[in-house]
């Protein structure tokens, strides 16, 4: 009897199909019944390669062998999944298998996986297509009752194959051409490029360029403290005309900012001591829950909440899906569920309401949804039009057991979002109060939750403040207690974290000017939810970016690539427009409006043009600077070029990048002039760990690291501190302490005849310690509160440096700041919020609670018992007033 072979994309789908259709017997990696054989791939099983005669070894990545544009491609099994491919090939070649059913995912990539498997088999058997939008058993049975003819799927297959081949052509040729260019002077400098990778890198580099060019600007705010019968509240002056004449060209302009101190102090003088006239408006508002998770939003949330990388989140979600079977398919870009999924949602809620599920953690929350019948048709949740290959990530009917801590955290995120989406909106009462002093407006805002709605899933209760609570004003009048002028500085744009970079990749279509191309990218962005984590990891592995805590910072290699691409005029490779153009044309192809050959001809021309520009490209010396300091070896002229600072008369050269750090021009000038520079921060070890070092020119005029250990040798030359200013007395032996190389050190602690060991770093945990702070430390035993220490785990913290009784230097942490008095509305919370949203630069007076732990990361210092537990980061910022004027009467002695 003839049978059809069903090929699913992954084993879990094969299991679902077997259960839905019934009657199958399992035989290892496949199922069988009278009319069907059923098995699956494990994602992609094959990858594109050029035919052998077109392929070259890595050492032959020269321009002579480029471009590589084969007339057709071969397929190569992916090593890790080759065994599964052999299983499928054996089943496909069975004589009783007379046709295939493509049950891979309903989309471009699912089509590609199946087409490559069939192409590799070299078999020509009839094909039918199972097209599913839902994995319920009824949906699967309905799908098999209406299988699609293969000819209707050919346009989608063409688009899938074109996407794969064009990515190969651009990526392989671009990478080999840029590698050949960067290796012209010898060596092998692999320089990867790609359709998604390079525009993503451009986003990071352009942000870093903005940060480097940024110049802080001073501005001032005027704050007032008012009192009424019920208590006190604060207000901030604002310009009522701001924004009424259109959007300002100044990106830092805000209604509350004054750009010269004189205006601020004049405003203060006009208002001090005068009464306030109060007007206010209170109105109810609602806030709906966020939509269900797709992979990108889950990765963003997990990165923001727990610091999980995009790759780690994907791995955890995949384990929860495949191993534990407690989440639905995670590699999705949909945030809705199928319209026929209401019954399944009800069953899932019943599972979550069980007290045995996660110790009853979700029981009361799930029961509330069931009791109130909140699951009902709602296009925001159940919408077939918003589903592509897969639906949103939600819990399955399987109760979790034996989850690891990270797995439990991610599962909890998904479950709570799933529950919250069915709850009613949260309800708030928002009050906006304007207090006018001599006509000048001061704004105060308050927000109180009336009904928590979906926020009750996250532990919020009615009556709690959500921002500031404003005390009541009964007669429309307020006493002005004080007026403060506060000074701030604008801050540069924040570097991307994985969470914000994922958002930028998802919304990259907004960067495209062409309307049709922007529309083509509107749903996809750069990459797909399943590939974005790999793109970020690829940039890390290729040394294009580094992780600094949660920040992603482009390396000199990234800037070098962008500089070259811009110089060669290959701007399309570095912008999202290439992806937009491809998506637009591939969608036309899916609709049968664009022939495959026409698209590939365009890609071939693009590839040839790209290689030609790189091959013939030259970066003239006029694009770089000539140093003013002569060559230390021959006194010749030292000229900067693409990779080095090179003497024009001899072989002396300093590489522009050392230890993953690029020299500044002033640093190279100092190195050549003095033979030493530093200490410099920002170097990285081969393990990616940051370090600081001096850099010296050796006797052979080679730049080398110097970690300041040369004077520890008993046979070393004595150090002459004549002419240097002593910073204070050594806490151990009372000798003089001087600045020396990487340390502040006792004069008796270096050179021959050492009798003391006092030494403390000039740079501690990536923070430079200023001379005046060392003087204060030696004199008083304690520095000022110092900010911007960075632990080895990337945690920023603030601390005092203190001198212990034994002379050793350690950390002491700031006392916990008192909470504001109840009934007094404070602008502190609001200002901290502005610090995140509007670039405010506030002075922090405390540090994260993790600072004590973070301080232990250093070997330079040992922590001293902290003076107090620390305040959390979110409430740490306080502003230092520039000037204070008050008409508050002095208190009488009691």
Can you say where each PLM-predicted feature lies in the sequence?
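Intrinsically disordered, low-complexity regulatory segments
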Residues: 1-172, 251-252, 492
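C-terminal or mid-to-C-terminal helical accessory/interaction module adjacent to the motor/catalytic core
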Residues: 139-224, 283
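C-terminal helical "lid" subdomain and adjoining coupling/linker elements of P-loop NTPases
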Residues: 185-188, 192, 204-259, 305
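Conserved short loop/turn motifs at secondary-structure junctions
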Residues: 2-5, 103-106, 187-190, 282-291, ...
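Metal- or metallocofactor-binding catalytic centers and their adjacent structured scaffolds
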Residues: 247-293, 509, 667
């Amino acid at each position: 009897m003839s049978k059809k072979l069903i090929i699913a994309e992954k084993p879990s789908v094969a299991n679902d199909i077997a259960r839905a259709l019934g009657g199958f017997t399992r035989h290892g990696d496949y199922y069988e019944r009278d009319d069907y054989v059923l098995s699956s791939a494990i994602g992609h099983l094959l990858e594109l390669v050029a035919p052998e005669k077109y392929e070259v070894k890595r050492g032959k990545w020269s321009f002579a062998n480029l471009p590589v544009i084969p007339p057709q491609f071969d397929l190569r099994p992916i090593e890790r999944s080759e065994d599964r491919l052999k299983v499928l090939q054996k089943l496909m070649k069975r004589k009783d298998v007379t046709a295939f059913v493509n049950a891979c995912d309903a989309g471009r990539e699912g089509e590609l996986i199946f087409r490559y498997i069939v192409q590799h088999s070299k078999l020509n058997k009839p094909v039918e297509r199972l097209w599913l939008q839902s994995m319920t058993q009824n949906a699967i049975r309905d799908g098999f009752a209406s299988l699609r003819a293969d000819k209707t799927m050919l346009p989608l297959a063409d688009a899938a194959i074109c996407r794969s081949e064009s990515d190969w052509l651009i990526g392989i040729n671009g990478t080999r051409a840029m590698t050949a260019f960067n290796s012209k002077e010898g060596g092998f400098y692999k320089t990867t490029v790609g359709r998604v990778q390079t525009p993503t890198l451009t986003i990071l580099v352009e942000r870093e360029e903005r940060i480097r060019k940024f110049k802080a600007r001073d501005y001032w705010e005027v704050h007032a403290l008012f009192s009424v019968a019920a208590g006190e509240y604060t207000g901030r002056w604002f310009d009522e005309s701001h924004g009424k004449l259109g959007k300002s060209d100044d990106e830092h302009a805000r209604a509350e900012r004054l750009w010269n101190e004189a205006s601020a102090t004049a405003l203060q003088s006009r208002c001090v001591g005068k009464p306030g006239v109060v007007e206010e408006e209170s109105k109810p508002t609602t806030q709906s829950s966020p939509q269900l998770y797709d992979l990108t939003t889950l990765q963003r949330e997990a990165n923001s909440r727990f610091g999980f990388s995009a790759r780690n989140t994907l791995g955890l979600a995949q384990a929860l899906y495949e191993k534990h079977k407690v989440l639905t398919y995670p590699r999705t870009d949909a945030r809705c569920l199928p319209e026929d999924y209401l019954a399944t949602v009800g069953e899932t809620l019943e599972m979550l309401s069980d007290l045995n599920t996660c110790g009853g953690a979700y029981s009361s929350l799930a029961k509330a949804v069931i009791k109130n019948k909140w699951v009902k048709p709602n296009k925001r949740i159940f919408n077939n039009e918003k589903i592509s290959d897969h639906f949103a990530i939600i819990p399955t009917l399987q109760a979790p057991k034996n989850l690891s801590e990270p797995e439990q955290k991610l599962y909890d995120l998904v479950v709570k979002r799933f529950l919250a989406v069915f709850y009613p909106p949260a309800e708030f009462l928002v009050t906006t109060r304007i207090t006018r002093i001599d006509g000048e407006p001061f704004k105060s805002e308050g927000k109180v939750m009336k009904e928590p709605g979906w926020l009750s899933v996250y532990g919020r209760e009615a009556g709690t403040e959500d921002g500031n609570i404003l005390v009541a004003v009964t007669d429309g009048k307020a006493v002005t207690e004080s007026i403060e002028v506060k000074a701030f500085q604008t801050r540069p744009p924040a570097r991307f974290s994985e969470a914000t970079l994922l958002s930028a990749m998802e919304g990259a279509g907004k960067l495209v000017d062409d309307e049709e191309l922007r529309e083509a990218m509107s749903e996809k962005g750069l990459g797909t939810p399943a590939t974005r984590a790999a793109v970020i990891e690829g940039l890390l592995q290729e040394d294009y970016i580094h992780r600094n805590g949660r920040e992603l910072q482009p390396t000199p290699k990234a800037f070098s690539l962008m500089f070259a691409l811009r110089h060669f005029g290959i701007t399309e490779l570095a912008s999202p427009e290439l992806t937009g153009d491809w998506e637009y044309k591939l969608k036309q192809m899916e609709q049968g409006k664009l022939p495959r050959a026409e698209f590939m001809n365009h890609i071939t021309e693009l590839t040839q043009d790209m290689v030609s520009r790189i091959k013939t490209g030259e970066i003239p010396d006029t694009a770089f600077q000539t140093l003013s300091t002569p060559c230390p070896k021959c006194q010749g002229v030292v000229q900067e070029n693409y990779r080095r600072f090179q003497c024009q008369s001899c072989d002396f050269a300093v590489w522009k990048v050392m230890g993953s750090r690029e020299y500044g021009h002033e640093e190279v000038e100092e190195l050549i002039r003095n033979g030493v520079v530093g200490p410099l921060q920002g170097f990285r070890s081969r393990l990616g760990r940051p370090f600081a070092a001096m850099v010296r020119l050796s006797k052979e005029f080679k730049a080398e690291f110097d970690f300041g250990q040369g004077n520890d040798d008993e046979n070393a030359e004595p150090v002459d501190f004549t002419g240097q200013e002593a910073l204070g007395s050594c806490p151990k032996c009372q000798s003089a302490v001087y600045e020396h190389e990487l340390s502040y050190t006792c004069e008796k602690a270096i050179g021959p005849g050492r009798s003391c060991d006092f030494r403390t770093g000039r740079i501690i945990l990536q923070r430079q310690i200023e001379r005046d702070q060392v003087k204060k430390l030696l004199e008083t035993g304690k520095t000022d509160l110092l900010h911007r220490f960075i632990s080895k785990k990337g945690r920023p913290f603030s601390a005092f440096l203190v001198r212990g009784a034994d002379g050793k230097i350690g950390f002491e942490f700031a006392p916990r700041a008192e909470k504001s008095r109840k009934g007094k509305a404070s602008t502190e919370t609001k200002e901290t919020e502005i610090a995140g949203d509007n670039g405010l630069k506030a002075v922090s007076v405390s540090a994260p609670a993790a600072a004590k732990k973070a301080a232990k990361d250093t070997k330079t210092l040992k922590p001293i018992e902290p003076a107090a537990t620390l305040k959390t980061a979110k409430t740490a910022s306080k502003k230092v007033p520039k000037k204070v004027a008050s008409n508050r009467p002095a208190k009488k002695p009691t």
